[in-house]
């Protein structure tokens, strides 16, 4: 047996979510820690191959934007699919921005998504037997902050 012959990872896009958010709620800010903010998740659309639905209201994205522009985020929200199944999503990650874009991002200006790194690691909770498989796989998410919403693309790692 060759224990060095480990199966390589592959990934496949399973679905995407376009999320509509409200204005950030500022919790606090200083020059050492950064800016803590809560961003309400209002709604959104789920799209995929036989995986479509909507984002339920009531979610929140808790962020801390460090003085160097790095954003540490932790979002909690739920989706309801067209077949009636509900899935709770916990999505933790980071967004790092090159120095030349830090001030634009801090002020809320639009920055080309290809100019920065925005990745998350989502986990899922569901009571639907049809989607329990999601709880047993690792996913990664590529994200983009667009002028009107946030685009998340979810990839299953195999």
From Swiss-Prot:
InterPro entries registered for this protein in UniProt: UPF0311
UniProt cross-references to Pfam families, sorted A to Z: DUF3237
Gene3D superfamilies per UniProt: 2.40.160.20
Family: Belongs to the UPF0311 family.
Protein name per its UniProtKB record: UPF0311 protein CA_C3321
